[in-house]
Amino acid sequence: IRCFITPDITSKDCPNGHVCYTKTWCDGFCRIRGERVDLGCAATCPTVKTGVDIQCCSTDDCDPFPTRKRP
């Protein structure tokens, strides 16, 4: 499977059986810069924590950088 990986946001091969994920969350600069974004691959979908949104998928390049919502 190929997944986009941060910080370069380039598509790279991941080991067999892994899933792609997009993780977003707010930090102290969220109002100015928008949500923080982490793209990658993992053996299993990461555990969701309070204030963190995680989306997992299992097809090539299914985790593009999310578009930002405009105010």
UniProtKB/Swiss-Prot annotation:
GO CC terms: extracellular region
Entry protein name: Long neurotoxin 4
Sequence similarity: Belongs to the three-finger toxin family. Long-chain subfamily. Type II alpha-neurotoxin sub-subfamily.
Regions crossing the membrane: none
Function comment: Binds with high affinity to muscular (alpha-1/CHRNA1) and neuronal (alpha-7/CHRNA7) nicotinic acetylcholine receptor (nAChR) and inhibits acetylcholine from binding to the receptor, thereby impairing neuromuscular and neuronal transmission.
Tissue specificity statement from the Swiss-Prot or TrEMBL entry: Expressed by the venom gland.
Keywords tagged on the record: Acetylcholine receptor inhibiting toxin, Disulfide bond, Ion channel impairing toxin, Neurotoxin, Postsynaptic neurotoxin, Secreted, Toxin
PROSITE patterns hit by this protein: SNAKE_TOXIN
Disulfide bonds: C3-C20, C14-C41, C26-C30, C45-C56, C57-C62
Single GO MF descriptor: acetylcholine receptor inhibitor activity
Localization of this protein: Secreted
Predominant place of localization: secreted
